């Protein structure tokens, strides 16, 4: 079996848990705290549901629900037959006859079904119109096809039919979600009990997040739906829930006032749950810069320089300021010969300089946040964005005034862009990624 812990035990050895045994992965003075009767939701890159650490002694799954957002949305009628055939060629199937030692290798065949019909019998509703939700029963059919009991409402489905192929979750390609789930909840079956997670007897709820890689805009909606699903599912089972979110973005003001952060605050009050989110690794990545001017001064003249590395296809620059401040902005291309001035009126504007298309969105304060936002989306008119040092010139306006004087600038997190992209004079302050900046997380 693939190892899911790797070198994580070194960090555990230096953790704040007293008397923590790095060999067994357990607190020697709290052996009764095993997570039994609770659930852990892993919102990440998916989980290898076949791994022994996520299975019971009898081989059945410990995963109560697995929502794979990356799969095409599949609608099922009462006979559990896929009626959304337009997406069928992109679905991932696994043969019920290819099991070996209860550890089924992935089968990427997509066109071996007969009559373009797949069988799926999830008992979990999918009101999100996104991906496929697999129930505990669905996963057990994949893991133990010859011994699975068939629900009475699925009498037309034969798990031993040699031509039947079951829809299955897609692979956890990066392995990150599997690694995280092992640290949280692995029961140690793959290592004969030598390496266990923190809560080895907890149940699991898994969401493989859909990643909109083609868009420069951060898709927080999929994450919000994932949290909503996990909390509602756990509450329906009366299970205390711990939600782990190994996800973070620089897209936002980092003040707890975004829709995502406010959503996290509200959902934390629903049922019995606690939300844990990764804070990111942005401190030394040069993706944040700040200016702090003197309030009520008459003149102000500064520049922010940032480098776009060769090979960037798209990225964004985000600027946040207090609404009461009046600033004049002008963006210069690396040549210094092309530039454009930001309009004073909110709206969406398009510019083309240095063979690069830049969409500028200006948003005024909303009922839930008091800041003005400038969002610049860079994309290439050829192959890549023009590389080099871009300069944002900032001045006070002749008729305006500076009340607060603080300006914050963000580029995408390091995972989204080339490591050489960044501000020339960065700031390591306020570099926690969203949603770890929410007050209830």
State what each model feature region is.
Residues 1-441:
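Loop-rich non-cytosolic ectodomains and luminal regions
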């Amino acid at each position: 079996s693939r190892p899911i812990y790797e070198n994580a035990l070194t960090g555990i050895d230096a953790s704040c848990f007293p008397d923590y045994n790095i060999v067994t992965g357990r607190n020697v003075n709290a052996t009764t705290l095993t997570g039994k009767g609770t659930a852990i939701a892993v919102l990440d890159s998916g989980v290898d549901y076949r791994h022994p650490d996520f299975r019971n002694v009898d081989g059945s799954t410990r995963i109560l629900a697995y929502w794979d957002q990356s799969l095409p949305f599949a609608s099922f009628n009462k006979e559990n037959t896929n009626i959304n055939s337009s997406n069928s060629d992109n679905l991932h199937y696994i043969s019920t006859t290819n099991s070996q030692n209860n550890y089924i290798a992935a089968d990427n065949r997509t066109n071996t079904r007969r009559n373009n019909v797949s069988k799926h019998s999830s008992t979990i509703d999918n009101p999100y119109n996104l991906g496929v939700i697999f129930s505990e029963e669905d996963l057990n059919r994949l893991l133990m096809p010859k011994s699975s009991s068939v629900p009475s409402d699925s009498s037309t489905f034969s798990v031993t039919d040699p031509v039947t192929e079951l829809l299955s979750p897609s692979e956890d390609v990066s392995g990150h979600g599997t690694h995280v789930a092992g640290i949280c909840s692995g029961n140690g079956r793959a290592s004969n009990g030598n390496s266990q997670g923190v809560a080895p007897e907890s149940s699991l709820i898994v969401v493989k997040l859909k990643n909109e890689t083609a868009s420069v805009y951060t898709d927080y909606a999929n994450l919000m739906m994932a949290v909503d699903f996990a909390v509602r599912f756990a509450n329906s089972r009366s299970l205390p829930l711990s939600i782990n979110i190994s996800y973070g973005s620089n897209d936002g003001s980092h003040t707890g006032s975004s829709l995502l952060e406010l959503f996290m605050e509200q959902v934390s009050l629903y049922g019995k749950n606690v939300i844990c989110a990764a804070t990111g690794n942005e401190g030394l990545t040069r993706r944040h810069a700040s200016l702090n001017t003197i309030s009520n001064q008459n003149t102000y003249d500064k520049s922010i320089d940032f480098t776009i590395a060769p090979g960037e296809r798209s990225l964004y620059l985000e600027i946040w300021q207090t609404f009461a401040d009046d600033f004049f902005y002008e963006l210069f291309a690396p040549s210094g010969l092309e530039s454009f001035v930001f309009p004073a009126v909110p709206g969406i504007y398009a510019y083309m300089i240095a063979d690069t298309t830049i969409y500028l969105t200006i948003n005024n304060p909303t009922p839930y946040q008091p800041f003005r936002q400038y969002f610049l989306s860079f994309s290439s008119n050829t192959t890549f964005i023009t590389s080099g040092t871009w300069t944002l010139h900032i001045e006070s306006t002749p008729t305006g005034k500076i009340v607060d004087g603080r300006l914050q600038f963000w580029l995408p997190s390091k995972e989204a862009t080339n490591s050489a992209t960044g501000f020339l004079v960065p700031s390591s302050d306020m570099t926690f990624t969203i949603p770890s900046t929410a007050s209830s997380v």
